Amino acid sequence: MSNDMTGPGTGRGVLSSLGDRMMGRASGSYAKVSKKSGPLDGLFLSQLIPALLLVLAGTITIWTASLTIADANFPRHLVGVALGLVVAMLVWRYDYRNLAGMTTVLFVLTCFLMVMPKIPGLGVSSHGMTGWVRLPLVPVRFQPVELGKVAAIFLMASASAQYNGKIERFSDYCRLCGTLLVPLALIVITDLGSGLVVLFLGATIIICSGAPRNWVLATIALIVGVSALVVITSMTDGLPHVLKDYQLKRLLVFADPSIDPSGDGYNLQQAKIAIGSGGFFGKGLGNATQAGNGFLPEAHTDFVFALYAEQFGFVGCVVLLGLFAWMIFATILLAMRIDAPFGKLVLVGCAALWTFQVLENVGMCIGIMPITGIPLPFISFGSSSMLTQLICVGIVQSVWRHRQKAA
């Protein structure tokens, strides 16, 4: 029997305790889920509705981008959305608990997806990065790292669920950190931005598994120290340069955009201009002059938030970010209602994935986060990203759908 089949009262880590205080676990309307409640109950819809509205917002934004940007292939975007919705439905029907306890299999799968672009004959370069894969006899390419994020969620949830919400031994904590470290090291080779996503979601799952605060704080201090050392050595002649030149440049541009006025600094400046020119209500659908006139690079991918903001203005941005907040908060509420450790932590991982990607993408467009190329969930152009986000929606619904079934 998997750890996810555990009854009420187990797996009560940080998230459960917070849920008890916020929601009143013993007596609130959400405290006892009726066995007669169907898949279309309030909590189900509270997470699904904003997700579908975000897909619609992304589709409209990419359609406007396709009017002036050749790479923004709108039919291909629609194919990605359709495929994602179909896969999400299949995931929703699948009992996610079949993956509980399969830590070794999930570990191997996650690592394989991370290194897949580096396999000779499979990896495809784009914009100087080898993060895509083109399978033999298949005329499409995809980013396995995006699917690797989903695998990492299940990996860390499976590895952490066995402790039932309380990690007591330091050796167990180190084992969890090591489980995260290996695929993280592999993904950083291909995509530093995605590596940060995996680090955030993995760390969030470990924290919500009941890791002692002192251990977590010490780990954070270690990560900060190592990161600072990596940056310093990469900037110093005669020392090993761990960061690639473009990665170091992006960090320096974050500190001072004038360092690279024709490269990343230019991209950031144009993104700010696009956002600011949108004003309060925006220029209107299809009237994004910064992107339309070619001033805003990667307007349909990395800087899609700037493209959206120019057309829909401050009000539109508030609505968009409100939808993200609604979806993420609803996912957290669902996690609070789940007693099974594995299901709870899977939902935590999905919420962490969306949270970090939204904060990083929006933050880099307005200059408060370094430029990393992390896509904005449901909005940025890219079938691999859209498929991953919709799979996560399906996972959330699967966890909620199968919450009542006995082992």
Residue ranges and their predicted role:
Residues S2-L54, T59-T190, L196, V362-P377, ...:
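Membrane-helix boundary/helix-loop-helix interface segments in multi-pass membrane proteins
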Residues I332-T372:
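Loop-to-helix entry and N-terminal half of a specific, functionally important transmembrane alpha helix
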Residues S126-W132, A218-V318, P341-F342:
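Hydrophobic, glycine- and aromatic-enriched re-entrant/interface helices and adjoining loop segments
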Residues R76-H77, S171-L176, T219, L345-L353:
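Alpha-helical transmembrane segments of multi-pass membrane proteins, especially transporters
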Residues C177-I206, T233-D237, F312-G316:
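Helix-loop-helix junctions and helix-breaking kinks within/between transmembrane helices
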Residues F295, L307-E310, C350-W354, G382-S385:
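Transmembrane helix-bundle signature of multi-pass membrane transporters/permeases
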Residues V79-V87, K149, Q311-F329:
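Hydrophobic alpha-helical transmembrane segments
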Residues L199-I207, A221-V224, V393-G394:
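Hydrophobic transmembrane alpha-helices of multi-pass, membrane-embedded glycosylation machinery
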